[in-house]
From Swiss-Prot:
Cofactor: a divalent metal cation
Database matches in InterPro entries: SurE, SurE-like_Pase/nucleotidase, SurE-like_sf
Protein name: 5'-nucleotidase SurE
Note describing how the cofactor binds: Binds 1 divalent metal cation per subunit.
Pfam families (UniProt xref): SurE (PF01975)
Disulfide bond positions: none
GO cellular component, one term: cytoplasm
Broad class of enzyme this protein falls into: hydrolase
SUPFAM superfamilies with a match to the protein in the record: SurE-like
Family from the record: Belongs to the SurE nucleotidase family.
UniProtKB keywords: Cytoplasm, Hydrolase, Metal-binding, Nucleotide-binding
Amino acid sequence: MNILVTNDDGVTADGILCLARYLSKKHEVTVVAPETEQSAVGHAITLRFPLWLRKIDINEEFEIYAVSGTPADCVKMGIDVVLKEKPDLLISGINRGNNLGTDVVYSGTVSGALEGAIAGVPSIAISSFSFENPLYETAAKFILEFLEEFDVKSIPRFTALNINVPSVPYGELKGWKLTRQSKRMYEDYFEQRKDPSGGNYYWMMGNIIENDPDPKADYKAVAEKYVSVTPISVFLTNEEYLKRLEERYEDKAIR
């Protein structure tokens, strides 16, 4: 397959290079990724400002391009400017740290995959669970084998797969599970600190809350050493609540 690879950790981050090296053993790979780290930029795109694209050479077996923008910018430019056609598959990652539960809302990695989904390209976001000790080779080996058994052409437009891989040696993985995006979230707080001149600044902190009763919650699979595979959608309409609203306000809604 012709695979376009992007990320949010930056074009020369260890995760994306590990992923591209493994994929290039069996596929044609092109890397188009941000020239600087873009973690937690969500689905931002660059408007009314220029974007720069440059090819970089670090002696790899695949072409690498750096973009002065976000992961979503990279996907757009990768398809329209670099490849000039849709690839067979887009993979965003390997992210340093998980993208579980509400992480998905903020993640540049996941947004890169969703941008591919908008463009009609089968797309996958992949993350290594641990930020402190990400095992990229485990995730790279997994995705290479996963592509042998999973029909990526079955992924419908506007849908992407969000994959989270436990940070354990590859041989310790128990397999993969189909999961749901969980209600895993953070209880945020801000720590006040002093800058060198004595002024106040704030550092955002957070405690993880994992109390989702759903047995298919994504984080539960990862905790049990399974790879979590969650189909996610570009569209955010709460269909259940919409139906309840329609029933309640049917006579009052403007037609």
